[in-house]
Amino acid sequence: MDRGEQGLLRTDTVPEEAEDAAATISATETLSEEEQEELRRELAKVEEEIQTLSQVLAAREKHLAEIKRKLGINSLQELKQNIAKGWQDVTATSAYKKTSETLSQAGQKASAAFSSVGSVITKKLEDVKNSPTFKSFEEKVENLKSKVGGTKPAGGDFGEVLNSTANASATSGEPVPEQTQEGL
């Protein structure tokens, strides 16, 4: 093999993030075969340790899940607990306390303002009701009502009105509309 083909068949590892590829190539060229072999053994050992730690972590996570299952802790309960804890943390902050206090004061002021507006409106309506113009209008409406309605008593339910109409028809000698229809 010539030198160009050897470069294509290199067995060096791919540089990690933020590692300069040119520095890696030049560093391996300055290391002896023995040093490179030592580093390869160390690399294999570290990779094996990482694999072992990954397996241990997986076993610990499985054990954790088993303990939670036995305690009756499920994902939904964990989520609820996390949200409750997060809310508790938020409400404990000074920013939340200041905001809450400010909003409470604003609410009290708004409530007082609405109460004041309601009182003013009520007073104005009473003033209008007691004004001579309104009294004159009220009298005119009452006069119109008495002229249109006559002296009929106010109120009464539908049955009373129906009975009084039937009685009035019977005394006048006119047949009740139902009788007229039956005769046809």
UniProtKB/Swiss-Prot annotation:
Q: Which residues form a coiled coil?
A: 22-74
PTM comment: the record says: Phosphorylated in a calcium/calmodulin-dependent manner.
Biased-composition ranges, Polar residues, are: 162-184
GO cellular component terms, A-Z = cytoplasm; endoplasmic reticulum; perinuclear region of cytoplasm
Can you name this protein? Tumor protein D52
Q: Where are the transmembrane segments?
A: none
InterPro entries in UniProt: TPD52
Quaternary structure note:
Forms a homodimer or heterodimer with other members of the family.
Please give the superkingdom of this protein's source.
Eukaryota
Q: Which organism is it from?
A: Oryctolagus cuniculus (Rabbit)
UniProt gene name:
TPD52
Residues annotated as carrying Phosphoserine in the record are S136
Q: Which UniProt keywords apply?
A: Coiled coil, Phosphoprotein
Which Gene Ontology MF annotations are present? calcium ion binding; protein homodimerization activity
